[in-house]
Regions:
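Short Fe-S-cluster ligation motifs
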Residues: 69-88, 372-407, 453-457
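Radical SAM/AdoMet-radical enzyme domain recognition
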Residues: 67, 71-88, 95-226, 444-457
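Local cysteine-cluster metal-coordination motifs and their immediate loop/turn environment
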Residues: 39-49, 299-302, 341-359, 377, ...
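C-terminal accessory region of radical SAM enzymes
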Residues: 241-271, 302-354
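N-terminal [4Fe-4S]-dependent radical SAM core
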Residues: 1-33, 76-78, 391-421, 438, ...
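Short, small/polar residue-rich loop motifs at catalytic or cofactor-binding pockets
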Residues: 282-286
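Canonical Radical SAM [4Fe-4S] cluster-binding loop centered on the CxxxCxxC motif
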Residues: 26-61, 410-447
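Long, K/E/R/D-enriched contiguous segments that form extended
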Residues: 207-277
Length: 457
């Protein structure tokens, strides 16, 4: 079909205001990841895709079979009224012509079937940003303007970014990515999503990198640590200090009012709610499916063979045979409790502590044997998180969102009320007569100690 025809179809009913944004925000969508190539033009030092290569690429015929399978399979259709297609690699923009064909094909197919996903479809790109500035990319965004979102991998300052996100010949990629970022920002006013990643070798750049990302215009910075076994004995202390220095900067500059970073999320490090203990953290296999270049089906992208040192992938079906529900069944029981040891199950700062069933499977040979490389780093994050919210209370005189969240997110989920008698110097009113000329006031130290007691009991 000609470009004019696809544009005409998309313009008839496909607009962002027709999509149930509330439903998307609550995570109510089927996430289908399509690995269009295992090739990448970068060699990032911390990348978990250890088996990238330049010969495994998806064909359009395979892509069409994947789309046909998703659209016609009852299991996929019943999972959600919303569909997210995530194009990934390698570097997906290396196969932009293929992605363009795939996007047109699924839109036309959904339209012809009057499918519920036609007005509830989003395309997502997980890209390193170096190949964005191209004619085909420009044409694609004009055509699929209303349902395509980009996530740029920008790690922070040029020094930090160029240390870890390098080209095949060892050069930094910061300048190329920033050029792409500014072009996208100039062309479109949409919010741009970013992701930054930190490992042992670059922790010392964390504070300056988060500030740099804020300066670029990212008000809510998404940043995380790698899950792999890379951490050294001194890293938790470095991480904690970097975050505390960042917290100090936020209050001294006033940016705590306008900007945020994931490390200071209000729930991070709270005791686990009872309902969290029996939930799957990521939804692999029942909220997400991933397809490799040959059309094999996996619970998520991290189960692909190229993501494992020993090529131990976990295939749960194919486009020819469909989903193997017996293979998926093993994932149904992967909850916090079932994959964790006694230490994790009794942890009092467990909320937001990352775990990955694919990593369990690849490193320990079982979905139910939790990898814990991140443990001490998470605890360091929690200490810094408490520091941030404590300073928030000192600066504002208000009860922090973290304290409120702890009550709401507690295991018992019931509100408790505590009264602080901060002074006995009450004025006379009605039938009450003032009994003291000089009042007794609760000291700040006593107030802080009492509040800590309440939080811990």
């Amino acid at each position: 079909m000609a470009i004019a025809d696809i544009n005409s179809i998309l313009s008839r009913s496909f607009r962002n205001d027709r999509i149930s944004k509330i439903s998307w925000e609550k995570g109510n969508y089927l996430n289908v990841t399509m690995c269009v190539t295992e090739e990448c033009n970068l060699e990032c030092t911390y990348c978990y895709m250890v088996g990238k290569n330049n010969f495994k690429k998806m064909t359009f015929e395979t892509a069409k079979k994947i789309i046909d399978f998703i659209v016609n399979d009852p299991y996929c259709n019943n999972l959600s009224d919303n569909l997210l297609i995530d194009f990934i690699g390698g570097e997906p923009l290396l196969e932009m012509e293929l992605i363009d064909k795939i996007s047109d094909y699924i839109c036309l197919l959904l339209y012809s079937k009057r499918h519920k996903w036609f007005n509830n479809l989003q395309f997502s790109f997980s890209t390193n940003g170096t190949l964005y500035d191209s004619k085909i990319m420009e044409d694609y965004l004009k055509k699929h303007r209303y349902h395509a979102g980009f996530g740029f991998s920008i790690d922070g300052t040029k020094e930090k970014h160029d240390l870890t996100r390098i080209t095949r010949d060892g050069k930094g990629s910061y300048d190329k990515v920033i050029k792409s970022f500014y072009k996208y920002k100039q062309d479109y006013e949409d919010e741009i999503f970013q992701k930054s990643t930190f490992s042992s070798e670059d922790l010392v750049y964390l504070k300056d990198s988060i500030i740099h990302l804020w300066d670029l215009g990212f008000k809510n910075v998404e940043s995380n640590l790698v899950y792999e076994d890379v951490w050294k004995e001194e890293d938790p202390s470095i991480f904690e200090n970097q975050l505390k220095e960042l917290a100090d900067y936020m209050f001294e500059s006033g940016r705590y009012l306008t900007h945020s970073v994931a490390y200071f999320e209000k729930r991070r490090g709270l005791p686990l709610a009872s309902n969290s203990l029996n939930q799957n953290r990521c939804g692999a296999g029942y909220k997400s499916l991933a397809f490799d270049t040959d059309g094999n089906i996996y619970p998520c992208i991290r189960f692909l063979e190229m993501c494992s040192d020993d090529k131990k992938g976990m295939i749960v079906g194919s486009i020819d045979k469909g989903v193997d529900y017996n293979a998926l069944r093993a994932l149904c029981g992967t909850t916090w409790t079932s994959v964790s040891d006694e230490e994790c199950n009794n942890c009092n700062v467990g909320t937001d502590c990352g775990w990955c069933v694919a990593q369990n499977y690849q490193e320990n040979g079982s979905l139910y044997n939790r990898v814990k490389h991140i443990c001490e780093m998470h605890k360091a994050n929690v200490r810094a998180n408490k520091y941030f919210w404590k300073r928030y209370e000192l600066e504002t005189g208000k009860t922090s969102d973290r304290v409120i969240e702890k009550v709401l997110f507690s295991k018992h989920n019931e509100l408790k009320y505590v009264y602080f008698i901060t002074s006995d110097d009450a004025p006379s009113f009605c039938n009450y007569t003032k009994r003291y000329n000089e009042g007794n006031y609760m000291s700040k130290d006593l107030y802080d100690n009492a509040l800590e007691f309440c939080l811990d009991n």
